[in-house]
């Protein structure tokens, strides 16, 4: 029943006719993107759920030195309310200094929970090594953990990961190529030559010939004004132009772990006959004891009797006619009552036989 439902939903989704979509929904402007930031810091104020690792102590000692407090070299602070953490955030395009970012804080060591902790000032750096934001604040942790004296433990969700809403202040903005050059380039989220050509045609229909040109299956280049304010207005007009994306190529996607099968609308089959049966072999071992007569000169022996049974389930053979469609394929699969693993075997065999017109993708 589950297989029938999954296949039916997939068939419905892929059978829907393509509809026009706005350019902003199917493409991005080249160079306008977010940037990842990461930092290393300390969370303090934990209620005994911190850690005592060596690198935690070193980080704690370094922090104290920055405040002018020097500890003896052989002194090891006993701390249970501190944890070392990784802090990361996404920095959107065009964000300016003084604006705020949400940050995620994750434990790096043996801390049991970050609940109730506070992140101390942490520099967030980009891939170029420059500091772009500074994070600090109290954590919001949805998970929790509790330990009993008898060794029992209760953990819900993930207590070693938390978030700080608006927990980082941007100190430096990232330059983008948006306001430079004579062109804007749109990159399709799903590469397709037909969709790229249709996008260029739709833009040219509105703005005039030769304003847009497809560069490849992903990129469409558009002539744009150099004035920044005009460029913003120009882009606002472009991103609301509607384009009808091209049909997807014929694909069959199979998740071998979950048994989910998605069949594209354009998948077709050449003439083929399929039958699928299962061979079951059962081996049973029976142990018997041979006990000689009490007055006989014999020894007690143990013998094993093996019983082997083999059975093969019979399945009806079904045939695919030329140009078999998605609907007919689904009905045929349901007719034989095939399990997801059986369907995968059938699809692989059809692909090897050259009867499956479409790309078989196993994930």
From Swiss-Prot:
GO biological process: bacterial-type flagellum-dependent cell motility
Source lineage: Bacteria, Pseudomonadati, Pseudomonadota, Gammaproteobacteria, Alteromonadales
GO MF: structural molecule activity
Family: Belongs to the FlgI family.
Binding partners and assembly: The basal body constitutes a major portion of the flagellar organelle and consists of four rings (L,P,S, and M) mounted on a central rod.
NCBIfam families hit by this protein: PRK05303.1
CC annotations in GO: bacterial-type flagellum basal body, distal rod, P ring; outer membrane-bounded periplasmic space
Gene for this chain: flgI
Highest taxon above the source species: Bacteria
UniProt KW keywords: Bacterial flagellum, Periplasm, Signal
Protein's cellular compartments: Periplasm; Bacterial flagellum basal body
Role: Assembles around the rod to form the L-ring and probably protects the motor/basal body from shearing forces during rotation.
Signal sequence annotation: 1-20
Protein name (record): Flagellar P-ring protein
InterPro entries, per database record: Flag_FlgI
């Amino acid at each position: 029943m589950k297989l029938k439902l999954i296949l039916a939903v997939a068939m419905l989704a892929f059978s829907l006719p393509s509809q026009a979509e706005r350019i902003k929904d199917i493409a991005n402007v080249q160079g306008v993107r977010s940037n990842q930031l990461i930092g290393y810091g300390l969370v303090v104020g934990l209620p005994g759920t911190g850690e005592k690792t060596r690198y935690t102590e070193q980080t704690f000692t370094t922090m104290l030195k920055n405040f002018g407090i020097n500890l003896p070299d052989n002194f090891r602070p006993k701390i249970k309310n501190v944890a070392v953490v990784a802090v990361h955030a996404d920095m959107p395009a065009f964000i300016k200094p003084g604006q705020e970012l949400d940050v995620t804080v994750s434990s790096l060591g043996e801390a049991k929970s970050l609940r109730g902790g506070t992140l101390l000032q942490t520099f967030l750096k980009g891939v170029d090594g420059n500091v772009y934001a500074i994070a600090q604040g109290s954590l919001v942790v949805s998970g929790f953990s509790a330990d009993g004296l008898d060794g029992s433990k209760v953990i819900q969700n993930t207590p070693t990961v938390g978030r700080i809403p608006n927990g980082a202040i941007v100190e430096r903005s990232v330059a983008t190529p948006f306001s430079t050059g004579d062109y804007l380039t749109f990159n399709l989220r799903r590469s397709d030559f037909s969709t790229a050509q249709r996008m260029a045609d739709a833009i040219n229909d509105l703005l005039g010939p030769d304003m847009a040109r497809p560069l490849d299956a992903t990129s469409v280049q558009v002539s744009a004004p150099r004035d920044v304010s005009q460029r913003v207005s120009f882009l606002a007009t472009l991103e609301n132009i509607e384009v009808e994306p091209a049909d997807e190529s014929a694909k069959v996607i199979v998740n071998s772990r979950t048994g989910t099968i998605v069949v594209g609308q354009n998948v077709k089959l050449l003439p083929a006959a399929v039958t699928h049966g299962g061979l079951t072999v059962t081996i049973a071992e029976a142990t018997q004891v041979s006990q000689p007569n009490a007055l006989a000169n014999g020894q007690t022996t143990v013998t094993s009797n093996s019983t082997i049974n083999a059975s093969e389930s019979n399945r009806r053979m079904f045939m695919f006619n030329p140009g078999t469609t998605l609907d007919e394929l689904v009905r045929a699969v349901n007719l034989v009552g095939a399990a997801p693993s059986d369907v995968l075997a059938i699809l692989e065999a059809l692909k090897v036989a050259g009867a499956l017109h479409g790309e078989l993708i196993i994930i």
